[in-house]
């Protein structure tokens, strides 16, 4: 946390020759401090929540590209299941009435049965009863805090947090001292060892799907991640899904149309996965905005349209967004942030970019958060 200068009483900093900050640790020291803290925290989580971590690893689910966007829930899923079941019954009747040895009729019946099973799977992907939300409208809240704080302050019921994670590296260099939304999630939970356990089946396979930094909507759904803050332990599901990086994709000769489709597909996948898994509160950031290159208005419009077309599919949505995007989200959703004590904010350093997965200085800090 940035320190207040007690010498001049104005929140300034002591300066040396050339205006150099004499009190601020340099960048390497900051990163090394975070690296040590990451190692300590990971060891603590393994010791305290070993059994729960193993269960989360076992129960995690990978949604292949396009699978999340095809999920159904509630009345939509029930209707699809009824149609598929009726088709299966008709095909079975036709097969029974066909002559013996009519392989074509038998094959049609088998296909229809498979369709019915697929519809049931889409309706309830993990076999969890009562997964369909019952709300008829979606309530939206906009906050300028990181996702873990939003979990403690603003979430109700079964909660899913969106981790805009690194596509090919578990935790996005968390263990090396990187800093960003994903690393913050890892630093307050047992998420990191879960991600590492899925390196081979999720992250390594993602290397074939980078697509000029647009990536895909291939996602890792982790149920019941444990968050710990001051002895208060909370559970939340975490969806690891990469943000498309429009800025780099255009440099890699991807078209505007490809960039727009990637963002729309990603948001569709996020909300459908949340709804199909019975999420009551979805916590998501300004997905795709900032240095990823998408205008905040474009992101907001896609989310607004989805919510309008599926009211109540996700009963509560909390946007945990940086200050620079907060006004746009509040204006769009009419959701003022609850009043909280005004923090003392110290100006941030300008930093360079270290790459897609570990550029911790890319982070647009929420209100009241500063770096040391």
Tell me the role of every PLM-derived stretch:
Residues 2-372:
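Macrodomain-like recognition of ADP-ribose-binding/processing modules
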